[in-house]
């Protein structure tokens, strides 16, 4: 039989026991041996939920200089104190179930 190298670089004259041709592989189970429980339903709130989202509209930068100038401006001014027309506000009310 030809010599085979092992991971350590030592030449072997016989294959490893795990490389035998007639070795059987153990079969894996096809079904879940530990099934997960179904997810629980979320508790419903007794009061309605109001979601408010604010984002800037018409906000566009065209050059790196404008990016730097606008970044400095944003650091000086509190976003809550900016002019209202710069922001769009969306309000969604989710009724109680």
Curated annotation (Swiss-Prot):
It holds the Pfam family SPAN-X. Keywords: Cytoplasm, Nucleus. It is found in: Cytoplasm; Nucleus. Detected in testis and sperm. It comes from the Eukaryota. A motif (Nuclear localization signal) lies at residues 37-45. One of its GO terms (cellular component) is nucleus. Residues 1-49 are annotated as: Disordered. One of its GO terms (biological process) is spermatogenesis. The keyword S-adenosyl-L-methionine does not apply. Belongs to the SPAN-X family. This is Sperm protein associated with the nucleus on the X chromosome A. The gene is SPANXA1.
């Amino acid at each position: 039989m030809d010599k085979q190298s092992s991971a350590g670089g030592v030449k072997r004259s016989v294959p490893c026991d795990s490389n035998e041709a007639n070795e059987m592989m153990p079969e894996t189970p096809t079904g879940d041996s530990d099934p997960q429980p179904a997810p629980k339903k979320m508790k419903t709130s007794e009061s309605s939920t109001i979601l408010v989202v604010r984002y800037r509209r018409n906000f566009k930068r065209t050059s790196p200089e404008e990016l730097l100038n606008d970044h400095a401006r944003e650091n000086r001014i509190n976003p809550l104190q900016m002019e209202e027309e710069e922001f769009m506000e969306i309000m969604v009310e989710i009724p109680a179930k």
